[in-house]
A protein has these predicted regions:
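Cross-family detector of peptidyl-prolyl cis-trans isomerase
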Residues: 2-9, 18-182
Length: 182
């Protein structure tokens, strides 16, 4: 009897620990993170729900539709787990028209070359209830650290890297580079 009771107790404790871990990424934790972040000095909350804070001000141009942007980024979940990043020396290059993550697209249109922003992207502006594979569970708020290196109209024959954000949003595998044709 004692053995059975100990086994039941062990299972219950394991389930409690699993629930506690899930709570760190659950709806309550995501909502609390958004509410707390909105109170931080310098945080701007847009009507869409996107939150951003300017960490460094640049003075270059803003991206226009169709531009090729180069950026450095780190993406974390609200519990601090890093889910994606560029390498420290090689920015991602992507066409603005291929950015399908609404929160990132909205922020990039507001930024200037040289800006470094912290973005807090609510789930509705990120990957929603579907999440993105094993890295991003469903209904997650994402925290970006983004530096916009450059924004320029595409040049004929210019090749840019695969847009990691469109790959995630479309749920397909990376398909190589994108070439701009006149």
């Amino acid at each position: 009897m004692k053995t059975i009771l100990c086994a039941v107790l062990a299972v219950m404790l394991g389930a409690a620990h699993a629930l506690a871990a899930d709570d760190a990424l659950g709806p309550t934790a995501n909502a609390a993170f958004l509410a707390d972040n909105a109170k931080k000095p310098g945080t701007v909350t847009r009507p869409s729900g996107l939150q951003y804070r300017v960490l460094r001000t640049g003075f270059g141009r803003r991206p226009a539709p169709g531009d090729i942007v180069r950026l450095f980024y780190n993406i974390h979940l609200v519990n601090g787990t890093l889910v994606d990043s560029t390498t420290p020396t090689l920015p991602a290059s992507l066409a603005m028209d291929t950015v399908t993550m609404r929160g990132l697209s909205e922020a990039l249109q507001l930024m200037h070359e040289g800006d470094r922003w912290q973005l807090v992207v609510p789930t509705a502006l990120a990957f929603g209830v579907k999440g993105q594979g094993a890295a991003i569970p469903p209904s997650q708020t994402l925290v970006f650290d983004v530096t916009l290196v450059s924004a320029a109209p595409p040049q004929p024959g210019q090749t840019v890297g695969e847009n990691p954000f469109s790959v995630w949003s479309n749920g397909r595998e990376a398909g190589g580079a994108i070439t701009i044709h006149p």
